[in-house]
């Protein structure tokens, strides 16, 4: 009897008060869970000396108290541990990616995560990530679940939660007043910091993604360009064949044809191309840029849209053209759902495919047969092929190229880019551009072979750029307003066959003069309609890159 009573008493005394879980959990999250944030804060020129230290302490107190305030609403005996587990694991994963790749977490990044396929996810896995998750996430979770919680009556628990919440608010107010001048100035001048507060950044971003569909006035897709018509061909004309190559993660500045010091585009240099160097992307991720590129709205209106509309691909289809989307990436992000599609992950090829991932060349495989399978009455009006590249998708750049394209050495053969020197990272990336150069050249050769029966042309534009270690930033996906230009400047390369130039009246020398013209993805929608000679109320000639370079036929 005495022994049993002693054990019960001991168990009771070893149990922790629920408020301690909230406070200590918040301290862990605000410190170790926010290493990426504190590294950024430490590098700020404004944060130095005693005043800088005071700001860091005040900022840390605000984060800790804010987390404690949130947890005070959720601090119920059977609910607290699962909630803290989610907080710890979310913070651990966020901390790893922010610290190692220099990314921030916003709604666009959460959208990228949701749309990531299995292969992309595996490319991000490495031992560094495992250790980070174990130390920052699993370790506190293990401690949490090993420690008993003191049982309180619900009225007592409610009172304690209110007390904890009030105390948290007082700390937030007090700390904010103490560092208000520095806090307001730093947060205004360094807006990226708000995307680093972990794990609140993830929870806020998830909330924005969940709420976004409800912000639209109409959940259905609104029709667009139903009046689209292709200009009638003259007796001597051939049906246009336009190949749209949607590049992936290609930096404009790493193309030899754009002045890069390395010969990354030897094949394109042999062709009669027009390369535009002043193009800015719509976003810094595929999930943002691709739907925006194929929208009539343009970047600003697309971001604030209240409705979803049919895309450029739909309008090409409405015009009666034969349209085919070939995807070697993670999908078309909704823009090609109403036209025929071919997914390369379903293919098997002894040299071009391995473990469900294919080199971009596979999209040229059996292409003639694919076109012949499209409706004949549409092919007589013209064909538009879209090829969505794997391109330079990171971080495993080395996986994107066959062995005979590993020209620039030494290369980084790891998906943990921070383990490699910047030279190795750049070499690996440049090898992907070298392979893209070869792929585009092969596509042009295929188009040339069809010139007897078609009027062929090619347009290559990338969705966004990439950071390769500049300022300790890797990959892409930073909020547009704080993203460096290397994530936003994209290549725009046009090849026109002699027949296409003649039929369309496009003047090559005029187009060459546009090399440094400031353009954006807003021009893409209207330029494609212009290339295919499609009339529609949604077409804006002023946004068509090629419009003022047409002769009067």
Task: Please place each PLM-identified region on the residue numbering.
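Active-site-flanking alpha-helical
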Residues: 255, 444, 470
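A long, amphipathic alpha-helix that forms part
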Residues: 4, 365, 371-372, 412-458, ...
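Transmembrane and membrane-interface helices of multi-pass
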Residues: 2-196
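Active-site-proximal alpha/beta segments of enzymes that process anionic O-linked groups
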Residues: 176-244, 249-413, 489, 516, ...
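Active-site rim elements
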Residues: 190-196, 301-302, 351-354, 422-437, ...
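Histidine-centered active-site microenvironments of extracellular/periplasmic hydrolases
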Residues: 259-263, 452-455, 459-505, 539-541
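Catalytic cores of PAPS-dependent sulfotransferases
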Residues: 73-82, 86, 315-325, 373-376, ...
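Flexible internal linker/loop segments at domain or repeat junctions
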Residues: 403-424, 500-508
């Amino acid at each position: 009897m005495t022994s049993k009573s002693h054990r019960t008493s001991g168990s009771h005394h070893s149990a922790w008060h629920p408020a301690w879980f909230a406070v200590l959990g918040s301290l862990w999250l605000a410190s170790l869970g926010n290493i990426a944030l504190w590294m950024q804060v430490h590098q700020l020129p404004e944060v130095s000396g005693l005043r800088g230290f005071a700001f860091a302490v005040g900022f840390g107190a605000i984060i800790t108290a804010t987390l404690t305030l949130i947890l005070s609403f959720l601090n119920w005996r059977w609910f607290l541990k699962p909630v803290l587990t989610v907080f710890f694991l979310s913070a651990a994963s966020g901390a790893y990616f922010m610290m190692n790749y220099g990314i921030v977490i916003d709604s666009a990044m959460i959208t990228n995560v949701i749309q990531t396929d299995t292969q992309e996810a595996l490319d991000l896995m490495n031992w560094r990530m495992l250790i980070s998750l174990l130390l920052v996430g699993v370790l506190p979770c293990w401690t949490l679940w090993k420690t008993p919680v003191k049982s309180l009556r619900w009225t007592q628990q409610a009172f304690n939660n209110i007390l904890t919440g009030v105390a948290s608010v007082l700390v937030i107010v007090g700390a904010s007043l103490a560092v208000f001048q520095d806090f307001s100035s730093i947060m205004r001048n360094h807006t990226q910091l708000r995307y680093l507060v972990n794990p609140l950044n993830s929870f806020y971003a998830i909330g924005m993604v969940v709420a976004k569909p409800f912000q639209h006035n109409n959940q259905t897709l609104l029709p667009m360009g139903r009046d689209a018509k292709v200009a009638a061909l003259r007796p001597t004309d051939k049906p246009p064949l336009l190949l749209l190559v949607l590049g992936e993660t290609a930096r404009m500045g790493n193309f030899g044809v754009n002045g890069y010091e390395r010969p990354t585009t030897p094949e394109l240099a042999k062709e009669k191309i027009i390369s535009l160097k002043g193009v800015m992307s719509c976003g810094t991720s595929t999930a943002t840029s691709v739907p925006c590129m194929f929208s009539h709205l343009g970047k600003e209106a697309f971001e604030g849209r209240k409705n979803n509309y049919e895309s450029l691909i739909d309008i090409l289809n409405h015009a009666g053209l034969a349209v085919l989307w070939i995807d070697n990436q993670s999908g078309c992000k909704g823009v090609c759902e109403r036209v025929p599609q071919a997914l390369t992950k379903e293919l098997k090829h002894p040299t071009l495919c391995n473990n469900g991932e294919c080199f971009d060349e596979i999209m040229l495989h059996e292409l003639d047969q694919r076109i012949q399978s499209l409706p004949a009455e549409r092919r007589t009006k013209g064909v538009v092929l879209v090829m969505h590249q794997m391109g330079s998708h990171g971080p495993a750049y080395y996986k994107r190229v066959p062995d005979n394209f590993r020209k620039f050495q030494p290369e980084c053969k790891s998906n943990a880019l921070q383990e490699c020197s910047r030279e190795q990272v750049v070499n690996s990336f440049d090898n992907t551009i070298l392979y893209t150069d070869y792929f585009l050249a092969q596509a042009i050769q295929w188009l040339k072979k069809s010139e007897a029966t078609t009027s062929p042309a090619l347009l290559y534009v990338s969705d966004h750029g990439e950071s390769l270690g500049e300022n300790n930033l890797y990959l892409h996906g930073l909020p547009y307003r704080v993203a460096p230009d290397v994530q936003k400047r994209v290549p725009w390369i046009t090849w026109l066959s002699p027949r296409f130039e003649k039929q369309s009246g496009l003047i090559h020398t005029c187009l060459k003069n546009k090399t440094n013209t400031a353009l954006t993805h807003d021009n893409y929608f209207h330029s494609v309609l212009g290339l295919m000679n499609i009339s529609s109320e949604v077409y804006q000639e002023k946004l068509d890159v090629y419009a003022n370079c047409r002769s009067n036929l």
